[in-house]
C-alpha cells in the first residue's frame, strides 16, 4: 500500500512538469543582470535568462526588439542562458525581456528588467539640508541640483534594498536653476544610508548622468561611543597636517568623522579588517577645518553613539601685529605663589586666550584698552602655583563670531616651579666674584645628587634661565656656565637649580646665592698686547714660537757661560796682581836702598812749574833718606811716557818731633790738581820771594792713579812748552807723621 502511494506521487509530480507543455502554456522565464542594473558606460554586462529544462532556444529583447538569440545544446541541457554585452554604452540602456522555445512552442516574456547606463551627462550636486547625523527613526532632507535644465532627478540608496526616489525639478525660469528636495525617512540604525543623485531626460529614462558625490547619513545608534583625540594637538597652525584618532569597538568596520554644522561627512575610513582604531588625516589644515568634531563607527551590529566633542582651533589667521606675553621678573617661581601673565597687542581683539602648550590649561579674558600705551591687554592671574602650572605658555587673540580662528601665537613663556626636588646644590664663581669688564667668568653649579640638567638664573633679569646638561666629574654632577667678555649688565645675584629630564619644568630648591660684580674695564696700558692669529696659521705660529724659545734659551746659556768664564779669569788676574804686589813689597822692604828718580829728561820751560815739581820729588826723597820713611812704588805699564808713579807712602817711624803743619786734605789736593789741569797760571815770583816753609806730608795709599795733562801758561816770549807735565792724584788712606821744615 505504501509502495503504491509513493509510485502514484512520483507520477503526479512528473506529469505536473509536462502538463503546461502539453496544454501549450510554458512557464515564464526569470531575467537577471550582473553586476548591477545600474552601470556606468564601458562596463561589461551579462544577462541571465532562467527557463525550464528542455528549452531549445532562448531570446533576449530590448524595448520589445529582439537583441540576441541563443540555441541550446542538447548534449548539455541547462535551465539558463547567458547574454554577454561588452563595453556597454547609452545605446544599450533600456527595458529588457527574455523568452524561450520548447517542443515548438514559445514561452511568455519574463518580467521587465531595466538596464540603466550612467555617465551620459554631467553629475548633479547633492547635499544634506539638515544635520547629516540623525537618531534612529529620524528623517533627513537632501537637496539635488541637476547640471542640465529640465532633467528629472532620481535619488538612490546604495545597498541590497535598491531604494530610489524620482521627482521632477523645480526650476527658476529666469536663472535656469533647478533643484529637488528629497525628504527621506525614517532611517534606522541597522544599515548604512549612502545616497547618490542622478539626472536624466524624460524621453530616455534609462540614460542617466554621472552620479553625484555620495552623502552618507549617520544614524546614531546604541553601541559604545568611541574616543577621539588629535595629533599633534587640537590647536594647530594653518597649513600644517594633523591626524585625528578614533577608537571604538573591535568589530568596527568603518569610522566616520563629522564636523558639527557641516552638511557633509568630513572623513571616513573603511578598515581592511575589523579593528578598534582609525587614523583620519586632515592635510593641509585651513581655516575651513576649524570647528567641533565627533566620530562614529559602524559594525554589523549597527551604529555607535557619537564620541565626545573635539574642538579644532586653527591659528595664524590674523598676523597683522604680534602679541606679547610677559610674566614675573624671573620665570622661576616658588610653589604656592601667584603669578600674573600679561598678554598685550596693538591690534584690537575681542578676547585673549592663554593656553599651555600641552593644552591641559586654557583661560580666556576680554581685552581692555590701555590709553597710556595704546595697547589692548588682558591680565591672567594663576595660582596658587602647583606642578600643573609648570610648562610653556602662549597667548592668542580671536573674535567672538569665529572662536576657533586665532591669531598668530605670542612669544613663548616658560614657568618653572621650584622646590620639587630635595637636592642640595652649590654654586661657585671663577676666577673671582669681582671682575673687570671684558674678562671671562665661569659659574659652576654642582651637586652630589643625581641631576640631569642644571639651570642658572639671575634675579630680576627677565630673561629665560640658562640650561646645561650635567657631567659627572670627581664623583659629582656639575655644569660650567662660561661667560666671555662680561659687562656691567651681567652684574647681579645668581642661583642655580637642578631638574630631571622626565620633568624639565619642575626644579629643585635653589643653591646659595652668588653675587657677581663687574667693575669698569681694564685700562689699555695695563693689558698686554694681543694679536689675532687666524686659525689656519696657528700651527705655523706655534712652531715659530717653539723655535724662538729654543734659540733664546741657547743664547742665554752661552751668555751665562761667557760671564762665568770672564769672572773666573778676573779672579785669577786679581790673585796674580796681589801676588805680584806682595813680591814688590818684600823687595822694597828688604833692599832698603834709596829710590832715585832720573829727572834729567823732564825739563820744563816754565820755571815755576819745574820748581814746584822739584820740591815735590825732593820732599819725597828727603822723607825716605832722612826720616826713614819707606816708599813703595809700582811700575807703570810699558810704554807709559809719564814714568814712575808713587802709589803708596808708608812711614816706618818718626825721627823728629816738633811742630807739625796741618794735614792737607784730599779736597785741597784735588783742587790743586784741577787747577793744574785747567791750565791756571802759577805765580812763580810770589813763590820764589816767600820764605822757605815747612812741607807737610801725609801718609798715602793709592790703588788707582788718575793722570792728566796740564797745559802750562805761555812764557813771556809766547812760546809753547816743550812737553806736558804729568801729575798724579793720590787718595789719602790714613794720617801719619811727616818731617818738619823741609825746604823745596
UniProtKB/Swiss-Prot annotation:
Report keywords, A-Z: Adaptive immunity, Cell membrane, Disulfide bond, Glycoprotein, Immunity, Immunoglobulin domain, Membrane, Phosphoprotein, Receptor, Repeat, Signal, Transmembrane, Transmembrane helix
Signal peptide positions on this chain = 1-24
**For side Extracellular, which residue ranges?**
25-543
Q: Which residues are glycosylated?
A: 79, 338, 440
Disulfide-bond pairs as recorded: 49-98, 144-197, 246-295, 343-395, 445-496
ITIM motif 2, short sequence motif: residues:
695-700
Modified-residue entries (Phosphotyrosine), positions? 697, 727
Give every Ig-like C2-type domain span: 26-119, 121-221, 223-316, 320-419, 426-520
| Pfam families in the cross-refs | ig (PF00047), Ig_2 (PF13895)
Location of the protein in the cell? Cell membrane
Q: Name one GO biological process term.
A: B cell homeostasis
Q: Where is this motif: ITIM motif 3?
A: 725-730
Q: Which regions span the lipid bilayer?
A: 544-564
**Assembly notes:** Interacts with LYN, PTPN6/SHP-1 and PTPN11/SHP-2.
Query: What biological function has been recorded for the protein in this entry?
Result: May act as receptor for class I MHC antigens. Becomes activated upon coligation of LILRB3 and immune receptors, such as FCGR2B and the B-cell receptor. Down-regulates antigen-induced B-cell activation by recruiting phosphatases to its immunoreceptor tyrosine-based inhibitor motifs (ITIM).
Q: Which PANTHER family match?
A: LEUKOCYTE IMMUNOGLOBULIN-LIKE RECEPTOR SUBFAMILY A MEMBER 5, MHC CLASS I NK CELL RECEPTOR
Q: What is this protein called?
A: Leukocyte immunoglobulin-like receptor subfamily B member 3B
The source organism is: Rattus norvegicus (Rat)
Taxonomy of origin reads: Eukaryota, Metazoa, Chordata, Craniata, Vertebrata
